[in-house]
Amino acid sequence: MQIITEPQTIQQACLRWRADGVHTALVPTMGYYHAGHESLMAHARAVSEKVIVSLFVNPAQFGPGEDFAAYPRDLERDAAMAEAQGVDVLFAPKAEDLYKKDHATWVEVPALSQTMCGLSRPTHFRGVCTVVTKLLMLTMPRIAVFGQKDWQQVAVIRRMVRDLNIPVDIVGRPIVREPDGLAMSSRNIYLTAEERLQAPHIHHGLALGRAITQSGERDAETIKTAIRRYWAQNLPGGEEDYLTIVDPVSLEPVDRLTGATLCATAVRVGQARLLDNMMLLGD
């Protein structure tokens, strides 16, 4: 596996591959890998001739007071895990090489970015869209693979590449969970032992919502009330950032469930802000 840090170097390599008709896949990451990341790399490896993994803790998607400085970093560990998954290139640029001092251009998808996570992180998706656009322009992959734990991120990026006519297929892959149901996340490292015991109840609450839906309930507020009641009893240390039931494509909230419907949440447990989601109706 090759480790590349210079943007122009990765772009030159990818231009050669594209000229030769090589099918490439990009897996954008912020590092500190776990089995969820490994599943994304494994999928990319299975469907592509060359796999590029980007490792970049993107300062532009963190707001004031967020965990940019604390976000876990271990390049040596991550490189070993990526190599074990058959990754061809690990692209690990420096922030100053992606964002020049006079950087003035941003990419936004306001229609999908101002709800859910965007309510408490108003500049987050501007940073995400800008860095993903940069990575796509540098690597020119046929596909880019993202985890569905951040469902909103996948929806935003899909709309972005559609609207900007970027020739890449955005692939969303299922959430990978711990045996007790907790969605795998690099931020799980922030949890204390007691918080780690409580955190799986985020998932269990969503599963209760799905069970209620499957029993015939179609009123969104009734379902959310049941989830919140469950959390109040089983997740006393949790602080809800948002809990919403939406159309999985448009992310528009729904009052009554009639077709494919997603329940998504962000919950703060101690120092960790944890995302999870679950389809209530549809695949």
Curated annotation (Swiss-Prot):
Broad EC category: ligase
GO biological process: pantothenate biosynthetic process
Location, primary (coarse class): cytoplasm
Binding site for ATP: 30-37, 147-150, 176, 184-187
Keywords on record: ATP-binding, Cytoplasm, Ligase, Nucleotide-binding, Pantothenate biosynthesis
Superkingdom classification of source: Bacteria
Residue numbers binding beta-alanine: 61
Cystines in this chain: none
GO molecular function: ATP binding; pantoate-beta-alanine ligase activity
Entry's EC annotation: 6.3.2.1
Pfam families, alphabetized: Pantoate_ligase
List of catalytic residues: 37 (proton donor)
Pathway: Cofactor biosynthesis; (R)-pantothenate biosynthesis; (R)-pantothenate from (R)-pantoate and beta-alanine: step 1/1
Residues that bind (R)-pantoate: 61, 153
Listed PANTHER family: CYTIDYLATE KINASE/PANTOATE-BETA-ALANINE LIGASE, PANTOATE--BETA-ALANINE LIGASE
Additional comment: The reaction proceeds by a bi uni uni bi ping pong mechanism.
Function as written in the Swiss-Prot or TrEMBL entry: Catalyzes the condensation of pantoate with beta-alanine in an ATP-dependent reaction via a pantoyl-adenylate intermediate.
Subunit structure, as described in the record: Homodimer.
Name this polypeptide is given: Pantothenate synthetase
Native source species: Nitratidesulfovibrio vulgaris (strain ATCC 29579 / DSM 644 / CCUG 34227 / NCIMB 8303 / VKM B-1760 / Hildenborough) (Desulfovibrio vulgaris)
Encoding gene (name): panC
